[in-house]
């Protein structure tokens, strides 16, 4: 079946879902969780086949890591489904209401977006995470995953269909599209049938979707995130923040990719942070000034880390989203240069300053144009769960409709209900 036909079916199914109660939608999520549990063996086996094919094709290690969906990760996905069911219903919000002088009663009520398309790469868990968020908010969803996860996504889609069928809802509410480039092109062209498209993946995928899609796009994800160590920073605190921002999960979009350090504290800070980063397996790409400091202060650590552990940074490094244990390091003259660097190379995701100077922190927080800005905390907190929103569909780096972690509320819009008694204008 072609994508436009699948989108038409999704539109019809969504109209049916829109009439259901919160309790009915939650029952559907619980049925999906049970179906995933019942089919866990088939899902994990399908994922093993995807992993074997990926290794044979020589895909990069970080991509293979993102592709993996073993028993433990699948159990986490299932817990996530049940956690979404426990979240407050985004449509059951008390409407804003007012009465006009002519007697018209106007209400602004929350409604689903409609049909949501998701284009994503190697993470099969996104198939379920995205689907249940969309369903909870009253939307149908079309899921276009990467070809490297085709078997996993198909198995997950079959389980979700079984869950929907169990509670009497249309299986067309959550459809896994073919993993072909043609399917992606058809989805991006389905403007009258798909209400919004959300790409989740690397910079290339997001850029291609934004440039080619005729469907409105919410741009997510690309995270060239910076941690700036100001001259008034607590250096021990800064060291722990940098280690967490880079090393706790380097393959995600809220991980730090560039470290900026004020010249006044560069030598003592890099003397402590450099060896700690190298010990954690991080490769450093440093400006000339940082390189000289690292080569002098971290010489014993460099001897054990290998020749590629610290190298001169290139222009490409400042704009790189490594998604790996690699960090660009630059010494700056002060706050002005740090702000200019972030304005030039940042992607509007998450930016952090470490400082004890309230004035410098305030200027940084006001000046940096990003979805999330931090003072004395790791960029790794840019996450729906960490912000208290529950699960998220992605992290928006644009300004219209949604910005930052996108929870259930961001999968809705509103309409006006106007109640009259014969008024004319």
Curated annotation (Swiss-Prot):
Entry-linked Gene3D superfamilies: Aldehyde Dehydrogenase, Chain A, domain 1, Aldehyde Dehydrogenase, Chain A, domain 2
Catalytic activity: L-glutamate 5-semialdehyde + phosphate + NADP(+) = L-glutamyl 5-phosphate + NADPH + H(+)
Keyword Amino-acid biosynthesis: yes
EC annotation from Swiss-Prot or TrEMBL: 1.2.1.41
Keyword entries, A-Z: Amino-acid biosynthesis, Cytoplasm, NADP, Oxidoreductase, Proline biosynthesis
Coiled coil residues, start to end: none
InterPro entries: Ald_DH/histidinol_DH, Ald_DH_C, Ald_DH_N, Aldehyde_DH_dom, G-glutamylP_reductase_CS, Glu-5-SA_DH, GPR_dom
Protein name as it appears in the record: Gamma-glutamyl phosphate reductase
Natural source organism: Symbiobacterium thermophilum (strain DSM 24528 / JCM 14929 / IAM 14863 / T)
């Amino acid at each position: 079946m072609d994508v436009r036909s699948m989108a038409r079916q999704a539109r019809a199914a969504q109209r049916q879902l829109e009439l259901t109660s919160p309790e009915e939608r939650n029952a559907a999520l619980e049925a999906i969780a049970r179906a995933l549990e019942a089919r866990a063996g088939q899902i994990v086996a399908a994922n093993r086949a995807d992993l074997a094919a990926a290794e044979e094709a020589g895909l990069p290690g970080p991509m293979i890591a993102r592709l993996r969906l073993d028993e433990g990760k699948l159990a986490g996905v299932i817990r996530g489904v049940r956690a979404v069911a426990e979240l407050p219903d985004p449509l059951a919000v008390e409407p804003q209401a007012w009465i006009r002088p002519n007697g018209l009663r106007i209400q602004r009520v929350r409604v689903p977006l409609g049909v949501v398309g998701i284009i994503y790469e190697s993470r099969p868990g996104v198939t379920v995470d995205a689907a249940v968020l969309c369903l909870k908010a009253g939307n149908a969803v079309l899921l276009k995953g990467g070809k490297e996860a085709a078997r996993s996504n198909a198995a997950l889609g079959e389980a979700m269909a079984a869950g929907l069928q169990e509670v009497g809802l249309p299986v067309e509410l959550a459809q896994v599209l073919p993993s072909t480039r043609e399917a992606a092109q058809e989805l991006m062209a389905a403007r009258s049938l798909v209400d919004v498209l959300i790409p989740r993946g690397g910079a290339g995928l997001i850029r291609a979707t934004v440039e080619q899609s005729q469907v409105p796009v919410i741009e997510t994800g690309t995270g060239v995130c910076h941690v700036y160590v100001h001259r008034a920073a607590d250096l021990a605190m800064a060291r722990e923040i940098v280690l967490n921002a880079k090393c706790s999960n380097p393959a995600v979009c809220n991980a730090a990719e560039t470290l900026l350090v004020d010249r006044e504290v560069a030598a003592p800070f890099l003397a402590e942070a450099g060896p700690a980063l190298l010990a954690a397996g991080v490769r450093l790409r440093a400006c000339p000034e940082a390189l000289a400091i690292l080569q002098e202060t971290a010489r014993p650590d460099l001897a054990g880390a290998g020749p590629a552990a610290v190298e001169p940074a290139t222009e490409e490094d400042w704009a790189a989203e490594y998604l790996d244990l690699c960090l660009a390091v630059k010494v700056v003259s002060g706050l002005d240069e740090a702000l200019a660097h972030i304005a030039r190379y940042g992607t509007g995701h998450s930016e952090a300053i470490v400082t004890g100077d309230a004035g410098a922190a305030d200027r940084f927080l006001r000046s940096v144009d990003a979805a999330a800005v931090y003072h004395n905390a790791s960029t790794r907190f840019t996450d729906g769960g960490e912000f208290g929103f529950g699960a998220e569909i992605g992290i928006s780096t644009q300004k219209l409709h949604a910005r930052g972690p996108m929870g259930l509320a961001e999968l809705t819009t509103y309409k006006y209900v106007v109640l009259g008694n014969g008024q004319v204008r």
